[in-house]
A protein has these predicted regions:
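Two-component/phosphorelay signaling modules centered on CheY-like receiver
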Residues: 32-50
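Acidic catalytic/metal-coordinating carboxylates
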Residues: 53-54, 81-84
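Short amphipathic alpha-helix used as the core "switch/output" element in two-component signaling
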Residues: 83-95
Length: 140
């Protein structure tokens, strides 16, 4: 386990990521249909996905699986608001791209997400083109 921690720390310090590390996404959403839809869209760009249905599950996945290049984060989850995790996750994993995806789109939520470090904010429903635009600068 120490080797994984050392590797993750090295990756975060250098921010020089290999192709494999750029191709991992964590999808945090309690709606299974959304998880599968996002996963299918991301697979078209060769991005591997892992699902978490709650914030607690996402924390466990982040602790055990290490680095994810993308985190697609729903806001309204069974155990809290995803938007409240952005700052903490960005502090711990500064080069992870956090992309909020929520049906509850408001100016206040967009502003808070942006101020806390979200890299993008996407309203549901979304199209694959919108998802691709959110990852193109980093997946090319």
């Amino acid at each position: 386990m120490k080797n994984n921690e050392d590797k993750m720390e090295s990756v975060l310090k250098t921010k020089k990521l290999n192709d494999q590390e750029r191709k991992k996404a964590l999808i945090v959403d309690d709606e299974t249909d959304i998880c599968y839809l996002l996963s299918n869209i991301l697979k078209q760009k060769n991005i591997q996905t892992v699902f978490a249905g709650s914030l607690a599950e996402a924390d466990k996945v982040l602790q055990s699986s290490g680095y994810f290049y993308y985190v697609f984060l729903d806001n309204h989850l069974p155990d809290g608001l995803g938007i409240n995790q952005i700052k903490r996750w960005k502090q711990k994993f500064p080069s992870t791209h956090v992309i909020m995806i929520t049906a509850h789109d408001s100016y206040e939520e967009r502003r808070k997400a942006s101020n806390d470090g979200a890299d993008d904010f996407i309203a549901k429903p979304f199209s694959k083109e919108i998802i691709w635009k959110s990852i193109v600068p980093t997946s090319a």
